[in-house]
Amino acid sequence: WIMGHMVNEIYQIDEFVDLGANSIETDITFDDDAIAEYTYHGVPCDCKRWCTKWENVNDFLHGLQRATTPGNSKYRPELVLVVFDLKTGDLSSSTAYKAGNMFAQKLFIHYWNAGNNGGRAYIVLSIPDIDHYAFISGFREAFKNSDHADLLDKVGYDFSGNDDLSATRNALNKGGVKDREHVWQSDGITNCIGRGLGRVRDAVANRDSSNGYINKVYVWTIEKYVSVRDAFDAGVDGIMTNEPDVIVDVLNESAYSSKFRMATYEDNPWETFKYK
């Protein structure tokens, strides 16, 4: 999965897919009532990027729906996965539940078109703080108490704060997520700073073990050729990047083209792939 980073205006969906992304990451901010408000990152952000692009969340979800609905004039079949980077920093552990519940309702109405031929992309809820596991509980309850519980089949979970893996596993379990139940594990830092791959390798080992909790591992945010090769060598499933075309270039190198390929809609993002 080549994951276009910080896609916060509708026009950027096409921009990043045109560069080779089959996945995008979008920032979500919340108002004082814990309701998702804008697709906005703010400063500081990655080097060589504008930090202040934004849309109203509802408008962005409609644009995303058009890009991921077969038959729509804006449909981009390559775009199969969306990571929502949930800016929960101003939430408390108690308001996190409400925020998750309300965000589920927004997705249901504005992305899934109230269950009637909405967008088809898989969704990953990415939360920076393991103490906000109640966001997941609230999100899941919104669907479990409805006639559309099947939409949870399209939803996965990630904690992005680079916490200890055992603490991350515990937070997922507290949120109601079983081991290997649609779990993506991220590791990374802004592209302005280098970061080693020690925790990435630990996450990959967990993914590949008989008693792990992880389905997929991705690293963020990298675009240097050497860093991309190192990530491939570490066995990641996804790379979040500001320059998808760099990932495509490396993917086409002889050392990697026989081992990796771009994920398509037919590839289940919740299924652990065993590297040979």
Swiss-Prot record:
Biological process terms in GO annotation: killing of cells of another organism; lipid catabolic process
Q: Which GO terms describe its molecular function?
A: lyase activity; metal ion binding; phosphoric diester hydrolase activity; toxin activity
EC number in record: 4.6.1.-
Q: Where in the cell is it found?
A: Secreted
What CDD domains does UniProt report for this protein, alphabetically?
GDPD_like_SMaseD_PLD
Its recorded reaction(s) are: an N-(acyl)-sphingosylphosphocholine = an N-(acyl)-sphingosyl-1,3-cyclic phosphate + choline; an N-(acyl)-sphingosylphosphoethanolamine = an N-(acyl)-sphingosyl-1,3-cyclic phosphate + ethanolamine; a 1-acyl-sn-glycero-3-phosphocholine = a 1-acyl-sn-glycero-2,3-cyclic phosphate + choline; a 1-acyl-sn-glycero-3-phosphoethanolamine = a 1-acyl-sn-glycero-2,3-cyclic phosphate + ethanolamine
Output the Pfam families linked to this UniProt entry.
GDPD_2
Task: Name the SUPFAM superfamilies for this protein.
Answer: PLC-like phosphodiesterases
Task: Report the superkingdom from the record.
Answer: Eukaryota
**Residues reported to bind Mg(2+):** E25, D27, D85
Q: What is annotated as the active site? A: H5, H41 (nucleophile)
Q: What does this protein do?
A: Dermonecrotic toxins cleave the phosphodiester linkage between the phosphate and headgroup of certain phospholipids (sphingolipid and lysolipid substrates), forming an alcohol (often choline) and a cyclic phosphate. This toxin acts on sphingomyelin (SM). It may also act on ceramide phosphoethanolamine (CPE), lysophosphatidylcholine (LPC) and lysophosphatidylethanolamine (LPE), but not on lysophosphatidylserine (LPS), and lysophosphatidylglycerol (LPG). It acts by transphosphatidylation, releasing exclusively cyclic phosphate products as second products.
> What's the name of the protein?
Dermonecrotic toxin LlSicTox-alphaIV3
Q: What organism is the protein native to?
A: Loxosceles laeta
